[in-house]
Amino acid sequence: MDGRVAIVTGVSSGIGNATARALVGRGYRVFGTARSAATVLPAGTERVLLDVRDEASIEAGVAEVLARAGRIDLLVNNAGGSVVGAVEETSLEQARDLFDVNFFGAMRMTQAVLPAMRAQRSGRIVFISSLLGFLPAPFAGLYSASKHALEGLAESLDHETRTLGIRAALVEPGFMRTNFDSNATLAANLVGDYQQARDHSRENFRKNTEGAEDPQVVAEAVVEAATAAKPRPRYPVGKRSGLVAGLRRYLPAAVFDGVFRKQFDLDFTGAPALPRTGGGRTAKPSTGERGAKVA
């Protein structure tokens, strides 16, 4: 892949860090986005100062990559964050901030690189989604909603640009060994009725991530999505992630609903326990300016 140029957002840790290293290892010239000049980047990665929430920043960053490298072959939309709490507990400001990063950040980046890719008549855009992009997520409902939106965007984009030589693909990690939960923002308007369930849910999430796989497995899926002659629309990643994806898509809705509620203990007075799917979202986000944590 010598000569190929990639942009990866959110490379300071987790999936973004592993992805940048994997692409460098495959011969890509990798530009990693960072909001600060002090951010430590993976070895072999070139820094581009860029904030996915800021259109002017993105335009300047993409222009810099084109000036330095002359082309863009791959965009990995990885930067993201999360808010932990029930839907009722999450403020509208937090919801807007989260969508501004997880959804609109990826959309801004995508729109910024597409003119160059169209001119080349080639390119690949990989979206880091999550199993929660097509599963319900008690106490991470806004995160799940942002990933559901991202999945719709990515699939639509792939159909729009395919005849132009540009492909889009989704990588859907399960639970991974990252700092994702510890860096999540807590919902702003906590309600006592949810406390036991919320706390227990977070504890189960932490237990699942402690025994989960390394983000390197996600990086390998990104490389496959980036280099395959005929990329798949989706790449579930993690222990049993493919099985969970299949159950979600092929079981009757009422049957899946019952299985899901049983796995989460949602019909009991006690707190729900996250299902042990080997999945979840990754990428260590850093503190955002307002409500969400961003990478």
Regions found by a protein language model. Give the residues of each.
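A glycine-rich helix->loop->beta "capping" turn
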Residues: 64-77, 83
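Conserved glycine-rich cofactor-binding loop
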Residues: 5, 12-13
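C-terminal beta-strand-loop-alpha-helix "lid" module of Rossmann-like NAD(P)-dependent dehydrogenases
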Residues: 162-210
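Residue(s) in the substrate-gating loop at a strand-loop-helix junction
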Residues: 130
